[in-house]
Curated annotation (Swiss-Prot):
Main location: membrane
Protein name: Putative RING-H2 finger protein ATL62
One family name in Pfam for this protein: zf-RING_2
Gene Ontology molecular function, alphabetical: ubiquitin-protein transferase activity; zinc ion binding
Transmembrane segments: 14-32
Annotated Gene Ontology cellular component terms: plasma membrane
Domain notes: The RING-type zinc finger domain mediates binding to an E2 ubiquitin-conjugating enzyme.
Broad class of enzyme this protein falls into: transferase
Length: 141
């Protein structure tokens, strides 16, 4: 066999082997991905919607709205929801479960859809009869 004929046989053999490996690869890929659409939601499946429930409205109403007094605090206090510093006469709520302070508009909006503090996630409904105050603790130096 001459050199050109041998080269043609090699090329055809290489192409045939490459085609076989490619076909095997595609079959394996199709087999491996066969059940991957099981996680998709089909219209016939029923969906269970989990709805976040907010705080009991009576508990929210029991948390008084107070006017902030900056002179009562040695450090500036910031609302962690809106990231603004409290200024004198800002209306605020102090959550009874953790004593975190927020502008009352933001607190009310949050608590209509969640029952925890937006800062520390403590349950706000746990301590309903807590006395609320924005004055500093007299025992803290």
């Amino acid at each position: 066999m001459n050199e050109d004929a041998l080269e043609a046989v090699r090329s055809r053999t290489f192409f045939a082997i490459l085609t076989v490996f490619y076909s095997i690869f595609r079959c394996c890929l199709a087999y491996c991905n066969k059940g991957d659409d099981d996680h998709l939601i089909h219209p016939s499946h029923s969906l269970h919607v989990i709805k976040a429930t907010g705080i009991n409205p009576s508990v929210l109403l029991s948390i008084p709205v107070v006017s902030f007094n900056a002179n009562a605090f040695k450090d500036n206090i910031e609302c962690v929801v809106c990231l603004s510093k409290f200024i004198d006469e800002d209306k605020a709520r102090v959550l009874p479960s953790c004593n975190h302070c927020f502008h009352f508009d933001f607190t009310d909006t949050w608590l209509h859809s969640d029952y925890t503090c937006p800062n520390c996630r403590k349950n706000v409904e746990e301590i309903q009869n807590h006395e609320l105050s924005l004055s500093p603790n007299p025992n803290s130096g």
